[in-house]
């Protein structure tokens, strides 16, 4: 059956709200290569939206899941617990850059992790308010939609959203927003909208994902830490997209001296299996009463087995170092292209969490059309890319960190061609 035939079946069988970017259908995948049902091959720089830092079907991950399949597939951890969950929590507790002694709880999706981080913060403080940032993306459930700082397409037609959520600007040199602008906005909130002692949490992404790979300045993170300490607010770092070696360190917060109280994780945690988590200061994590956290599939044993494999792969294959090496090669390609492509307004990121932003060279305004044109040129040559950003004018790069050098070089050649056409 052809891609088009599957496409017609999809239109008939599934709702339009589940938007689909590609008009081809996956047949198989290995490492950084994806093959469709017609036999066409693509270099996958989308990686299931940052889920495959260790690549498609890494042999060690497949073996770990197969071994777990022979033991049991589900018990519901809060009914019958299992050792692998506890061991994974111990590993995350030792690795995560959070304040004080740590504890970890596992869930299923990134949105679930963020929802539970807010629950934990509210239980700990007894306060309702949450401050988030414009351009941030935290999920598609109601609380996480409220936290998300972008309306289209995530919020259209779904209001009203949960209250006591407030947004402030996220720093962006390109768009003229300084760290001080962000901090001044928080202080204005305290004066005009909610008193500081009613704020449970400030949540931010150290590198905004859907927002365009904007990197939080160290001064911003330090100031958030000071504000949280001063007012008894819980500091939450959302690492759903940035975690597990993507930025050249295991977590993006490892780039900063200041530590959050809670940190959310998902996506590449289990290499394609549905697993998320919240790790944080033990005293804060213990605020909810027994039964307040959990979920039927939370910490599923197959996904937990995959996560153990992911951590081993990252260590064994030195993927943090690999992320820095590949990211520098990508940056060099983009910076060189910038000299002859006036539409390139900025190249930014950490490690292999790199993005390029496009403006109309005539008007200087953000141009989603240019980003989409380059995305389609690359796709026509077999390179799968994703756009993002508040204006849809950013291309982000999320290749598996396990991609072979020759394939990465081939992707860079396609990217150069797409930028120069």
Which residues does each predicted region cover?
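Conserved N-terminal phosphate-binding loop of PLP-dependent enzymes in the Aspartate aminotransferase
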Residues: 1-421
């Amino acid at each position: 059956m052809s891609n088009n035939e599957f496409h017609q079946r999809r239109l008939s069988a599934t709702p339009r709200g589940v938007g689909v970017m590609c008009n081809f259908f996956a047949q198989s995948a290995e490492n950084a290569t994806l093959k469709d049902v017609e036999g066409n091959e693509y270099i996958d720089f989308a990686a299931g939206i940052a889920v495959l830092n260790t690549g498609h079907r890494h042999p060690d991950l497949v073996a770990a899941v197969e071994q777990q399949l022979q033991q049991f597939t589900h018990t519901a951890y809060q009914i019958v617990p299992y050792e692998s969950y506890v061991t994974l929590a111990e590993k995350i507790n030792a690795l995560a850059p959070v304040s004080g002694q740590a504890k970890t709880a596992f869930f299923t999706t990134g949105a679930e992790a963020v929802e539970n981080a807010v629950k934990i913060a509210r239980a700990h403080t007894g306060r309702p308010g949450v401050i988030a940032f414009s351009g941030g993306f935290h999920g598609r459930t109601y609380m996480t939609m409220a936290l998300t700082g972008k309306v289209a397409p995530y919020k259209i037609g779904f209001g009203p959203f949960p209250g006591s959520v407030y947004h402030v600007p996220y720093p962006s040199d390109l768009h003229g927003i300084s760290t001080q602008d962000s901090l001044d906005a928080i202080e204005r909130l305290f004066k005009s909208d909610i008193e500081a002692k009613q704020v449970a949490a400030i949540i931010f992404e150290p590198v905004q994902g859907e927002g365009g790979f904007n990197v939080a300045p160290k001064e911003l993170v330090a100031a958030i830490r000071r504000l949280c300490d001063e007012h008894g607010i819980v500091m939450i770092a959302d690492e759903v997209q940035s975690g597990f070696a993507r930025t050249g360190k295991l977590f993006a917060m490892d780039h900063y001296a200041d530590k959050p109280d809670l940190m959310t994780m998902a996506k590449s945690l289990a290499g394609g299996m549905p697993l998320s988590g919240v790790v944080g200061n033990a005293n804060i994590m213990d605020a909810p009463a027994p039964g307040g956290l959990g979920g039927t599939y939370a910490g599923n044993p197959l996904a937990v087995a995959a996560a153990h494999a992911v951590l081993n792969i990252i260590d064994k294959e030195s993927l943090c170092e690999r992320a820095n090496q590949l990211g520098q090669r990508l940056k060099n390609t983009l910076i060189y292209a910038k000299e002859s492509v006036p539409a390139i307004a900025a190249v930014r990121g950490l490690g292999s969490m790199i993005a390029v932003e496009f403006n109309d060279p005539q008007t200087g305004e953000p141009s989603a059309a240019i980003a989409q044109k380059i995305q389609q040129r690359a796709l026509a040559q077999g390179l799968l890319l994703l756009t993002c950003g508040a204006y849809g004018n950013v291309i982000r790069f999320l290749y598996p960190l396990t991609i072979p050098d020759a394939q990465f070089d081939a992707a860079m050649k396609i990217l150069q061609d797409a930028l120069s056409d």
